[in-house]
Curated annotation (Swiss-Prot):
Keyword Cytoplasm in annotation: yes
EC number(s) recorded for this UniProt protein: 2.7.7.87
InterPro entries: DHBP_synth_RibB-like_a/b_dom, Sua5-like_dom, TC-AMP_synthase, TC-AMP_synthase_SUA5
Position of the signal peptide: none
Protein name: Threonylcarbamoyl-AMP synthase
Main function: Required for the formation of a threonylcarbamoyl group on adenosine at position 37 (t(6)A37) in tRNAs that read codons beginning with adenine. Catalyzes the conversion of L-threonine, HCO(3)(-)/CO(2) and ATP to give threonylcarbamoyl-AMP (TC-AMP) as the acyladenylate intermediate, with the release of diphosphate.
Family: Belongs to the SUA5 family. TsaC subfamily.
GO biological process: regulation of translational fidelity; tRNA threonylcarbamoyladenosine modification
Residue spans crossing the bilayer: none
UniProt keyword terms in alphabetical order: ATP-binding, Cytoplasm, Nucleotide-binding, Nucleotidyltransferase, Transferase, tRNA processing
Keyword Lyase: no
GO CC annotations, alphabetized: cytoplasm
Subcellular location, record wording: Cytoplasm
Amino acid sequence: MVSSWRVQQAAQDIRAGAVIAYPTEAVWGLGCDPWDEEAVYRLLAIKSRPVEKGLILIADNIRQFDFLFEDFPELWLDRMASTWPGPNTWLVPHQNLLPEWITGIHETVALRVTDHPTVRELCALVGPLISTSANPAGRPAARSRLRVEQYFRGQIDGVLGGSLGGRRNPSVIRDIATAQIVRAG
């Protein structure tokens, strides 16, 4: 487990506009403060990812997403709560409460409550984070710190060390309205 002071330093860096890499359940991720437009666009440029695709928000608990859930049916809240924390990402209507640099061209936003202990601690300190796999567009996602450093040396602001969570595949992505799988895990 990563020492708490390293997580606190990463949180401080994120608050200051940093783009960092960190281990997640299955692959290494890149993240930043979702409300920092400059940081998000820098992350997108580092990955060569078009803004139109949208990004995932991760959190340490469902309450960090409450601002999006005001008019949600109880069934939707139950669906999310029954699968979190864990490797389930839900596409939910963003109701124009999020900027386009997070949602892209979509009417929905991807949300996940992580069960990775280091990332949960980080989100507990800074709130929800942008999280995307640590790889340039078209390349395999990084499964080691070495690969992260090979891909992004000199482009990101830091690497929060630690181990992957042991999952083989990225999270399942489901549509909240239908519970249909959009991407298998």
